[in-house]
Amino acid sequence: MFSLQELCRKNIYILPYPLGKHVLQQLGLYWKGHGSLQRIGDDHVLLQQDLIFSINEALRMAGEEGNNEVVKLLLLWEGNLHYAIIGALEGDRYDLIHKYYDQIGDCHKILPLIQDPQIFEKCHELSNSCNIRCLLEHAVKHDMLSILQKHKEQIRLHLALTQILFELACHERKNDIIRWIGYSLHIHHLETIFDVAFAHKNLSLYVLGYELLMHKVNTEAAYIELPNLLSYHLRTAAAGGLLNFMLETIKHGGYVDKTVLSAAIRYKHRKIVAHFIHQVPRKTVKKLLLYAVQARAPKKTLNLLLSSLNYSVHTITKQLVHNVVIYSSTLIVKLLLMRRKNKLNLVDAVLARLVKYSTYTDIVQFMSEFSVSPERVIKMAARESRTFLIEMISKAAWGNHPQTLIHHLKQLAHTMKSQSGKDLIIYTIHYIYLNSNMLVAEEEKNIFKLAKFYANHNAVNRFKQVCEDYYALDVDARFKTLILECFEIAVQKNYPRIANIVDDYVRFLFYRGDITEEEIHEAYSLKDAEFYVDLKWLQHDLF
């Protein structure tokens, strides 16, 4: 516990009136050789009513003199013991250090407070467990170059230690020490200085790295693949957007090529691309544009590349389309469409490739982005035999109502030029028909139209099945009308198989008495009808 005197000394800031030397000595507020000692504020002292010092500076002075009484007083005033130890080292007061040794803790914590290399080394010696390597590492951390110079020969004998100290100096960014090690000692690997320079975007460290690299190249016989190293540095600098680093590398023989600018594009550093784009061949710019699409570069970067090509990309259209589809990068398509002059429409080409190779989700996204009609996509899907797409896009566009779906798909079949595509749409229509509940009297008109549609497109088997279904609805008069109209279609379009099916139904209806001889003769009186049917059966039955 504190004594009453200590409590008074600790908490009295301003003395009530000037006290005599004897009273001050009794209070412990007298510093031999200096005079009265008074606390001012939280961290200063007044000496002999005249001089003001920080408490820690006063501690250093007291430690240097070995005045333990003043040290104890200043510690009561919340001074830092480390300054007393520094002063004791300066005055070689090891007896004072011994008294406080257990309170010091880690001596390394005192080192940042020391400016004098000799005191620095003496302080480090207080720690019995440390060796020369520990001293040298702390010398690097705290910029004590003279200590390193003092132990130069010892460092030189240990190549591994040299490398360790060099790398530590790089991480601590101690340029003077790095330069000294680089010129005075042998460094096996220089990579660390560049790694740290890139990590902290420290240009001065990067320049120093090249200074040491060129010194090493010119003075040592070691083989260094300088072109590869320069290229690597350029790519790294481009990826980090460090133009000044790139310019420094170029001074030493670096060359900006496609891989370097690709790194700038990938990490969205347009200013670097803009700085060098006019220094590379046109062929390289085209490759960079393709890569920019792949990397989904922003609008400004794409426009920069397109502008340098005068928006003339016809020779790489196929590759552009490929990259747009593979990497889902459609911005280039929009930019080319926005041009008033030299406009290039890649929508159809991209859409065709999407329909052929991509997923339903990708296609729908593209349709939404470029306002593509479902009819357009369904026709493409039919040409590529992608039944699933036809079904999914149809339902997404027109709902899941069978009659609506069939109506729209029939319209597409009428305008479809590709026969295989038309057949697939008809197949889809029939699939919808078979999986719906249309075979009811209420759907008679729709089934009638569907049968005529099949007849118009020579869909023989589907026509036959729908006719059978339609007959099952028991609408004799309408069935006869359907059969006769379909016969006319078959004759006009030269569909013999449809005509044969109709002829079979005509005979059936005649035997049932649902159609007269006159109606048959009238229907079969069409031009060229005799090439499709033989009326001898009718004459034979009449007689």
UniProtKB/Swiss-Prot annotation:
State the name under which the record lists this protein: Protein MGF 505-10R
**What parts of the sequence cross the membrane?**
none
Q: Which UniProt keywords apply?
A: Early protein
InterPro entries to which the protein is assigned, alphabetical? MGF_505 (IPR004858)
Please give the family membership noted in the entry: Belongs to the asfivirus MGF 505 family.
Per the record's keyword annotation, is Manganese included, yes or no? no
| Chain's role | Plays a role in virus cell tropism, and may be required for efficient virus replication in macrophages.
Description of what induces expression: Expressed in the early phase of the viral replicative cycle.
Q: Which domain of life is it from?
A: Viruses
Q: Which Pfam families match?
A: DUF249
